[in-house]
Amino acid sequence: MELQTIRPNLVQAIRAYRVDDLMSAADAAGQHFLYANLSTAQSKQDVLDGIAAAFTFPAHFGKNLDALFDCMTDLVHKSGPQPGFVVVLEQLPDNPRFDREAREQLLEVFRDAAEYWGERRIPFRCFYSFQ
């Protein structure tokens, strides 16, 4: 699989792709591969903690959606030229503590990040699945 066959700067369900294939494709393209398995997360805070740990966010990460956006965009942008990103959020919770509205708010942050990187002509692809 080659990343060129997947439209850049999007957020979509992982259905048609395997995590290992996405990781290999990111590696072959020289892009960052960011993976978070959120199978034990039950709440918004659990999800943010899981993403922060998996993506090795700095200790000062504010653990809210604004801070998530900052870590996915501005903080990375300031660290120098970026080759592109493949992000996988696997097993997002689907329960009353992390309901559809919470999932949409989280995915909107990643859509905004995709737009941010797209404006800079940097590919950003985010894939997700639910528990």
How does the language model describe each region?
Residues 1-131:
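Positively charged, polar, low-complexity stretches
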